[in-house]
């Protein structure tokens, strides 16, 4: 468990909104639109001093100089187990200075997190009225803080069970479709073995909560969000966890501000957090800090203020639970692509995010669509001007989509493979989930001379920009063609994947 944590022996859970409001003090009286400016030079200096203060205190405690400790008010969860995790000459610390080939750009680590690339335009804050009390809670599984909180440490309340308090589970229909043929049943069986369990996300969120407590000692008004596949409904038991640290709602310069902040966090993690290992600071187009949590065993990637990742997490989450066939189909396709070596953006193939968008696009473009375009049907729920503290709440009341298309899972998998093997025009079309159809390519630099074009639903960038080599594109197309032929002939999932071995591995976790 985490040293000296107040959550020892229990899961940290959100406060009920009424109690949380009482604990938040003066902040409830402030207008939500007053976005805090946290990035002045004075605040960077103060953040560095905060780190130094806690580091000095830790060293004195470790050396036994208890009587010389200055009278610093320390929160009850201050960590006392401070062992450095990497040495200055270790691969982890020297990795950040490795030079990349000029033709490589930042593909290796940038495209892996391309879903977190923020739009260039600023988010508009039009919310002039304070939020209702029941809307001032954080995202699923997070300690519930108001957006503008007081500097005092958050108060956690012990709960016996979180199933009734956690937003993450209180409105989701997880009913699975009925399988009436062998292939569809195989897909369902594999999906049930692959899908992320409640215990998996709890472990990730415990670490997120601990990290947030530490980070708020440097940036008191910051918020740390779990995003990506861990939260969007398409995660597996072995999915990495993505974290987004939000300091302000406006876009942030990733080369200056975000890099500075991540440098401070890297120092904080290095000097104070003994439960973190394999710490790396990756200086890419979208810089991240990578690390592993010893307690849960989960791998984390932390970025700063790439808020589009929060928005698309909840867009994809809404699609995931809109129709019961979506999640099983997506998870099996992701597993197939990973098994055949075409699901790794750092190696010039497709990111998991791109694969999900491809599946959603296919389901939108059937003669009788299984999915609509949510951004066209419910534009107010996915408005880019919406404040971040409302993003998770807006789509909650979208009803399930009732499609007249009753195609079984097995036929949908076969149809997906056929669509991208022989029907989709890679050279002329752009995949657009936002529009719910394929768009003709323009002469814009984003699409010119690109092998695969998949539009990011919020910022309009190409999520498949990692595929920049003809050889990798040909390999991807060949895998689609080979899989379509094998499944068409055998109607057996074993022709695509070693299902038994995968299920056995998942069950052993």
Swiss-Prot record:
Alphabetically ordered keywords of this record: ATP-binding, Cytoplasm, Developmental protein, Differentiation, Magnesium, Manganese, Metal-binding, mRNA processing, Nucleotide-binding, Oogenesis, Transferase
Highest taxon in the source lineage: Eukaryota
Protein residues bound to Mg(2+): 240, 242
Pfam families: MTPAP-like_central, PAP_assoc
InterPro entries membership: MTPAP-like_central, NT_sf, PAP_assoc
Catalytic reaction annotation: RNA(n) + ATP = RNA(n)-3'-adenine ribonucleotide + diphosphate
Compartments in which it is found: Cytoplasm
Keyword ATP-binding carried by entry: yes
Principal subcellular localization: cytoplasm
EC number, as in UniProt: 2.7.7.19
An example Gene Ontology molecular-function term: ATP binding
Domain PAP-associated: 409-462
Region annotation (Disordered) ranges: 88-107
Single GO cellular component term: cytoplasm
GO biological process: mRNA 3'-end processing; negative regulation of miRNA catabolic process; oogenesis; RNA 3'-end processing
Keyword Nucleotide-binding: yes
Cofactor(s) named in the record: Mg(2+); Mn(2+)
Record text on subunit structure and interactions: Component of a complex at least composed of cpeb1, cpsf1, tent2/gld2, pabpc1/ePAB, parn and sympk. Following oocyte maturation, parn is expelled from the complex. Interacts with rbfox2 and sympk.
Function field: Cytoplasmic poly(A) RNA polymerase that adds successive AMP monomers to the 3'-end of specific RNAs, forming a poly(A) tail. In contrast to the canonical nuclear poly(A) RNA polymerase, it only adds poly(A) to selected cytoplasmic mRNAs during oocyte maturation. Plays a central role during oocyte maturation by mediating polyadenylation of dormant mRNAs, which contain 5'AAUAAA-3' sequence in their 3'UTR. In immature oocytes, polyadenylation of poly(A) tails is counteracted by the ribonuclease parn.
Family listed: Belongs to the DNA polymerase type-B-like family. GLD2 subfamily.
Full protein name: Poly(A) RNA polymerase GLD2-A
Gene: tent2-a
């Amino acid at each position: 468990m985490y040293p000296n944590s107040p959550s020892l022996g229990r899961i940290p859970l959100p406060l009920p909104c009424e109690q949380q409001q009482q604990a938040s003090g003066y902040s409830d009286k402030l207008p939500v639109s007053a976005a805090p400016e946290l990035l002045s030079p004075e605040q960077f200096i103060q953040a560095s001093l905060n780190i130094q203060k806690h580091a000095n205190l830790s060293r004195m405690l470790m050396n036994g100089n208890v009587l010389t400790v200055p009278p610093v008010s320390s929160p009850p969860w201050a960590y006392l187990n401070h062992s450095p995790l990497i040495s200055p000459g270790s691969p982890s610390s020297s990795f950040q200075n490795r030079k990349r080939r000029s033709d490589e750009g930042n593909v290796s680590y940038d495209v892996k997190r391309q879903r977190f690339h923020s739009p260039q335009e600023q988010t508009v804050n039009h919310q002039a009225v304070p939020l209702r009390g029941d809307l001032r809670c954080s995202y699923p599984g997070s300690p519930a803080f108001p957006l503008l909180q007081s500097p005092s440490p958050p108060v956690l309340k012990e709960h016996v069970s979180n199933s009734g308090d956690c937003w993450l589970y209180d409105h989701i229909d997880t009913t699975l479709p009925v399988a009436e043929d062998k292939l569809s049943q195989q897909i369902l069986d594999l999906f049930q073995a692959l899908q992320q369990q409640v215990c998996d996300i709890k472990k990730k969120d415990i670490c997120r909560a601990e990290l947030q407590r530490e980070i708020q000692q440097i940036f008191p008004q910051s918020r740390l969000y779990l995003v990506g596949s861990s939260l969007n409904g398409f995660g597996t038991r072995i999915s990495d966890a993505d974290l987004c640290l939000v300091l302000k709602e406006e876009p942030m310069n990733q080369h200056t501000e975000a890099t500075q902040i991540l440098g401070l966090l890297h120092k904080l993690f290095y000097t104070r957090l003994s439960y973190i290992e394999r710490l790396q600071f990756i200086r890419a187009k979208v810089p991240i800090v990578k690390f592993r949590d010893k307690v849960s065993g989960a791998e984390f990637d932390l970025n700063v203020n790439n808020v589009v990742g929060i928005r698309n997490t909840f867009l994809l989450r809404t699609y995931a639970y809109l129709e019961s066939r979506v999640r099983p189909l997506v998870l099996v396709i992701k597993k197939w692509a990973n098994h055949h070596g075409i699901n790794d953006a750092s190696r010039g193939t497709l990111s998991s995010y791109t694969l999900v968008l491809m599946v959603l696009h296919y389901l939108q473009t059937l003669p009788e669509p299984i999915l609509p375009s949510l951004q066209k049907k419910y534009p107010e729920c996915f408005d880019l001007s919406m404040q971040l503290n409302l993003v998770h709440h807006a789509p909650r009341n979208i009803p399930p989509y009732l499609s007249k298309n009753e195609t079984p899972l097995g036929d949908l998998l076969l149809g997906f493979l056929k669509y991208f093997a022989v029907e989709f025009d890679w050279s002329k079309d752009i995949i657009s989930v936002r529009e719910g159809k394929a768009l003709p390519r323009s002469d814009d630099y984003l699409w010119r001379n690109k092998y695969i074009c998949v539009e990011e639903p919020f910022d309009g960038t190409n999520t498949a920009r990692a595929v920049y080599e003809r050889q990798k594109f040909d390999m991807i197309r060949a895998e689609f063609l080979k899989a379509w032929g094998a499944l068409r002939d055998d109607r057996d999932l074993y022709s695509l994947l070693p299902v038994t071995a995968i299920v056995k591995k998942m069950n052993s976790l």
